[in-house]
Amino acid sequence: MKVRPSVKKMCEKCRVIKRHGKIMVICQNPKHKQRQG
């Protein structure tokens, strides 16, 4: 899980979602998981 100020899709499989008021990226590739900090 990467925590960064701006989250971007890293591939076509990435999905940007909102959980508990936080913007997150979920993907089949676990390296692409991100959360806005």
Swiss-Prot record:
Location of this chain's protein in the cell: Plastid, Chloroplast
A single Gene Ontology CC term: ribosome
Keyword Cytoplasm set for record: no
Major localization class: plastid
BP-aspect Gene Ontology terms: translation
GO molecular function: structural constituent of ribosome
Keyword Plastid: yes
InterPro entries hit by this protein: Ribosomal_bL36 (IPR000473), Ribosomal_bL36_sp (IPR035977)
Pfam family name, one: Ribosomal_L36
Keyword annotations: Chloroplast, Plastid, Ribonucleoprotein, Ribosomal protein
Family membership: Belongs to the bacterial ribosomal protein bL36 family.
Name this polypeptide is given: Large ribosomal subunit protein bL36c
